[in-house]
């Protein structure tokens, strides 16, 4: 069996990773250099599927213009086109049985894809966005997501959808240093947007006032007139607009991949707050932070225990005051904080590794293929 997977990264991260490519490196070497940063899913599907001899796998990072040019240079019979054409050319060349379109680049042509390429037996996609519109995503055989509310929306429009929790790639631990004693206190790594992260904004602002928090917020800038300030004004969120000034002044920037894992591993605790519309926990940070053994402070949801035992493998809170109280307690009891993080790590490595994530994916694919 052969599988091709299409993925994409944000423009900012993709641009930074492009710097890894020089004139001397070809397509395969370029892939190796970019995936070595372990950003998002990287090439972890290929790693596990081929290690377990389940199927030959081709990973395609659509957002890398440098990789695209190198691929076409190695395939002179193909004329370089846009992102969709690039994906179609990759399919024509690789001839996969299974197409996992995580980037959803094939959506405009998904209805006719099997007619165009009769060797394709299964198409799948991923939806992790709470505000997505499944009624506009028809055509794939399988749909995967991370939380029940997204699954419910897909099932309601007739999609065959499955929850597949995120997984932690255990080999990351071979590329970072996890200190025996963590002296840094509390960190937050992520984004901050009006209309989506109002609770997150309040929590971070309160912890900032407590002088215990360091933050890396990837979607805010620095200065008087920034995109983030204009965004808050557009939403009429004047409290967030006011709060942005100190956030931007002391913001440490965007973190991704190995650098993100290494940073979280140096802290006793990290804040993990879901979007305002999310009813259940299920984001990537659960496995990322848990995988490096950092004690997580998570906004409580009804399915919390499906991931972590409260107060044993993670610390959950319902109100900002409760969070502040628990942060003070954990700072006064560093050994207990450390043990919670290590217990979470054991749970992640046992139940939520990336190998387990890939195994769940393939179980659904094989079930569809019969």
Which residues does each predicted region cover?
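Nucleotide-sugar donor-binding catalytic core of glycosyltransferases
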Residues: 1-60, 68-71, 142, 146-287, ...
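Internal alpha/beta domain cores that form substrate/cofactor-binding pockets in large enzymes
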Residues: 38-94, 99-132, 136-141, 159
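A short, well-ordered alpha-helix in the C-terminal region of glycosyltransferases
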Residues: 336-350
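Conserved acidic donor-binding segment of nucleotide-sugar-dependent glycosyltransferases
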Residues: 283, 314-320, 329-334
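Acidic, glycine-centered active-site loop in nucleotide-sugar glycosyltransferases
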Residues: 305-313, 318-319, 325-326
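Hydrophobic alpha-helical packing elements
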Residues: 323, 340, 357-361
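Acidic-and-aromatic substrate-binding clefts and catalytic sites of carbohydrate-active enzymes
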Residues: 101-108, 131-133, 254, 277-281, ...
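C-terminal alpha-helical cap of glycosyltransferases
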Residues: 354-370
């Amino acid at each position: 069996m052969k599988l091709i997977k299409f993925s994409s990264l944000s423009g900012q991260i993709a641009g930074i990773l492009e710097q890894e490519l020089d004139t001397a490196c070809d397509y395969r070497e370029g892939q190796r250099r970019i995936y070595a940063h372990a950003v998002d899913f990287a090439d972890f599907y290929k790693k596990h599927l081929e290690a377990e001899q389940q199927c030959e796998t081709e990973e395609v990072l659509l957002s890398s213009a440098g990789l695209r040019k190198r691929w076409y240079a190695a395939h002179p019979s193909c004329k370089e086109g846009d992102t969709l054409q690039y994906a179609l050319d990759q399919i024509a060349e690789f001839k996969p049985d299974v197409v996992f379109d995580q980037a959803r680049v094939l959506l405009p042509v998904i209805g006719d894809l099997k007619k165009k390429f009769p060797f394709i037996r299964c198409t799948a996609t991923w939806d992790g966005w709470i505000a997505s519109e499944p009624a506009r995503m028809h055509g794939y055989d399988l749909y995967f997501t991370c939380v029940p509310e997204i699954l419910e929306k897909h099932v309601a429009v007739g999609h065959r959808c499955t929850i597949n929790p995120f997984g932690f790639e255990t080999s990351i631990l071979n590329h970072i240093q996890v200190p025996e004693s963590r002296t840094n206190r509390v960190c937050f790594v992520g984004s901050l947007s009006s209309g989506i992260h109002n609770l997150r904004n309040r929590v971070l602002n309160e912890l900032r006032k407590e002088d215990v928090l360091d933050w890396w917020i990837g979607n805010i800038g620095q200065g008087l007139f920034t995109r983030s300030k204009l965004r808050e004004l557009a939403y009429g969120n004047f409290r967030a607009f006011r709060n942005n000034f100190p956030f931007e002044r002391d913001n440490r920037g965007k973190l991704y991949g190995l650098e993100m894992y290494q940073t979280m591993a140096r802290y006793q605790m990290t804040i993990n707050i879901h979007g305002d519309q999310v009813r259940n926990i299920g984001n990537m940070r659960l496995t990322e932070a848990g995988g490096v053994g950092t004690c997580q402070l998570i906004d409580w949801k009804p399915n919390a225990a499906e991931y972590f035992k409260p107060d044993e493998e993670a610390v959950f809170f319902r109100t900002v005051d409760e969070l502040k109280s628990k942060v003070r307690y954990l700072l006064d009891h560093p050994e207990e904080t450390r043990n919670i993080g290590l217990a979470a790590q054991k749970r992640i490595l046992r139940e939520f590794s990336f190998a387990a994530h890939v195994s769940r994916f393939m179980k659904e694919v094989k079930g569809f293929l019969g």
